[in-house]
Swiss-Prot record:
Protein name: Basic phospholipase A2 PLA-B'
Residues annotated as the enzyme's active site: H63, D105
Entry's transmembrane regions: none
Cofactor note: Binds 1 Ca(2+) ion.
Major location (coarse): secreted
Lineage per the UniProt record: Eukaryota, Metazoa, Chordata, Craniata, Vertebrata
Role summary: PLA2 catalyzes the calcium-dependent hydrolysis of the 2-acyl groups in 3-sn-phosphoglycerides.
Disulphide bridges, residue numbers: C42-C131, C44-C60, C59-C111, C65-C138, C66-C104, C73-C97, C91-C102
Length: 138
């Protein structure tokens, strides 16, 4: 519980991209991201290893891979701009790097939404010591 509280405090205090990603997830899924996704499966949250546990965890795996392709900015901290039109997220701005980060986040938020029916509470706070399968490549 303490880790969850610390994560919540850190994310609320961030003015850059992590707070934006949180808002995007909330908009697309209706779920509170810190509670529902920060420690989900083997790939949601910090780091990642092993094989994704389900479709939601795979969203995080793909998101990590997407971040791995971004060059020229810091995907976790650089600020980007986006708007929401008719329920769709539109990434904006002139900076190609931060726009790419926004597109990674948008794809993950949509993936979470599209997999809400298979979301499993048992993976909400899944201990990574159980992520022992060979790690997949992007």
């Amino acid at each position: 519980m303490r880790t969850l509280w610390i994560t919540a405090v850190l994310l609320v205090g961030v003015e850059g991209h992590l707070l934006q990603f949180r808002k995007m997830i909330k908009k697309m899924t209706g779920k509170e991201p810190i509670v529902s996704y920060a420690f989900y499966g083997c790939y949601c949250g910090k780091g990642g290893r092993g094989k994704p546990k389900d479709a939601t965890d795979r969203c995080c795996f793909v998101h990590d891979c997407c971040y791995g392709k971004v060059t020229g900015c810091d995907p976790k901290w650089d600020y980007y701009t986006y708007s929401s039109e008719n329920g769709d997220i539109v990434c904006e701005g002139d900076n190609p790097c931060t726009k790419e980060v926004c597109e990674c986040d948008k794809a993950a938020a949509i993936c979470f939404r599209d997999n809400l029916k298979t979301y499993k509470k048992r993976y909400m706070t899944f201990p990574d010591i159980f992520c022992t399968d060979p790690t997949e490549k992007c």
